[in-house]
């Protein structure tokens, strides 16, 4: 009897240590989520989850160990129930349970889930029993197929991202040409003042331009219409005006006013 009691105490101590470690890990993780959420990174969250998962697995191993007695065979009976505040209970429960009364005992010493939870569990069990074996197998195969396709897509994206990160990006432009183009557009660097023949302005020697054309056209006769002495209209070349005194022609009343090239209005 004493051997079983010692074994039970040792198992309880080991179980309490594992639960304390799990509680500390949960407390630190909750503190990070509430106070350090702005600096929290996804790798640190994964590390916290991995730590909690490892501690839960260790706790399950302790419970399933062959030297651990079956705690379900042990009976816990409350000896004293009081509505008054218990300081020792407050200290042991870290302020979560101030009193050990009739309202608290059913919640903390219950060995079965709540009646609502039991009802939901029964409903789920009944619904699962209604499904036939063939239909359940088809649903399982469909779910496995969807999961396999999803895992394949995720692994493909990971491989492509890793290969894209290792392979250097191919350059599709020449930086020298880009800089030269920007300098030419912004500052005119590398641009010359060359103009094609015939496009230069008047006054440039050696290049025929608009001034030469206008100078050649200055010799055209200008006809002054009667009644409009200040308006001069240039006549096209090749048009011959009838002169007075020519035989067979009527004397024209139009007077021609021929000016020299220096007096042409466009030659300034």
From Swiss-Prot:
A GO cellular component annotated for this chain's UniProt record is: nucleus
- Answer whether the UniProt record assigns the keyword Phosphoprotein to this protein: yes
The answer to whether the entry has keyword Transcription regulation is: yes
Q: In which pathway does it act?
A: Protein modification; protein ubiquitination
Which positions carry Phosphoserine?
82
| Stated name of the protein | Mediator of RNA polymerase II transcription subunit 8
> Subunit comment for this entry?
Component of the Mediator complex, which is composed of MED1, MED4, MED6, MED7, MED8, MED9, MED10, MED11, MED12, MED13, MED13L, MED14, MED15, MED16, MED17, MED18, MED19, MED20, MED21, MED22, MED23, MED24, MED25, MED26, MED27, MED29, MED30, MED31, CCNC, CDK8 and CDC2L6/CDK11. The MED12, MED13, CCNC and CDK8 subunits form a distinct module termed the CDK8 module. Mediator containing the CDK8 module is less active than Mediator lacking this module in supporting transcriptional activation.
InterPro entries per record: Mediatior_Med8_fun/met
UniProt lists compositionally biased (Gly residues) regions at 200-209
């Amino acid at each position: 009897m004493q051997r079983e009691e010692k074994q039970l105490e040792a198992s309880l101590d080991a179980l309490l240590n594992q639960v304390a470690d799990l509680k500390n890990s949960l407390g630190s993780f909750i503190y990070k989520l509430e106070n350090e959420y702005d600096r929290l990174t996804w790798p640190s969250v994964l590390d916290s989850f991995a730590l909690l998962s490892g501690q839960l697995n260790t706790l399950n191993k302790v419970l399933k160990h062959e030297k651990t007695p079956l705690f379900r065979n042990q009976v816990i009976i409350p000896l004293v129930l009081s509505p008054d505040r218990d300081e020792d209970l407050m200290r042991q429960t870290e302020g979560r349970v101030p009193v050990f009364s009739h309202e608290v005992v059913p919640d903390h010493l219950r060995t079965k889930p709540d009646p609502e939870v039991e009802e939901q569990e029964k409903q789920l069990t009944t619904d699962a029993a209604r499904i036939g074996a063939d239909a359940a197998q088809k649903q399982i195969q469909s779910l496995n197929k969807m999961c396999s396709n999803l895992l394949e897509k995720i692994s493909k994206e990971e491989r492509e991202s890793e290969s894209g990160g290792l392979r250097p990006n191919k350059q599709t432009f020449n930086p020298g040409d880009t800089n030269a183009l920007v300098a030419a557009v912004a500052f005119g660097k590398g641009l010359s003042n060359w103009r094609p023949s015939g496009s230069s302005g008047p006054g440039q020697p050696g290049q025929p331009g608009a001034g030469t054309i206008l100078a050649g056209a200055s010799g055209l006769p200008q006809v002054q219409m009667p009644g409009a002495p200040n308006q001069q209209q240039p006549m096209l070349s090749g048009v011959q005006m009838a002169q007075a005194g020519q035989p067979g022609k009527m004397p024209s009343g139009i007077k021609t006013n021929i000016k020299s090239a220096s007096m042409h209005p466009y030659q300034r």
